């Protein structure tokens, strides 16, 4: 059965991601031990005016840094726009085609 890493290791991974150049913020980090290795995921917030390519490059760099500095098999990253509401989680989007939209 898998389990999360200890708080110290999770904080260290968070710090590594947060210190990646051009990452504005990090949230929703999840970790799992897989044997003696770590599988993690994180939402990274980047400047909303960047291109998709630039946002992807930042996420790739965050992943590289985590895999280099920690016993990580993988870091799955989700790129979110910085300082914008997260419309994916918790908010209801109103359909513009509806009579009330």
For the regions a protein language model found, what residue spans apply to each?
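Alpha-helical transmembrane segments and adjacent TM-loop junctions that form the membrane-embedded core
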Residues: 1-101
């Amino acid at each position: 059965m898998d389990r999360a890493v200890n708080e110290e290791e999770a904080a260290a991974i968070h710090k590594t991601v947060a210190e990646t150049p051009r990452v504005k913020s990090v949230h929703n980090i999840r970790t799992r031990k897989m044997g003696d290795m770590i599988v993690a995921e994180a939402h990274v917030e980047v400047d909303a005016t960047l291109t998709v390519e630039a946002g992807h490059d930042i996420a790739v760099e965050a992943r590289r840094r985590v895999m280099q500095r920690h016993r990580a098999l993988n870091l799955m990253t989700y790129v979110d726009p910085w300082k914008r509401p997260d419309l994916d989680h918790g908010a209801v989007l109103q359909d513009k085609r509806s009579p009330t939209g």
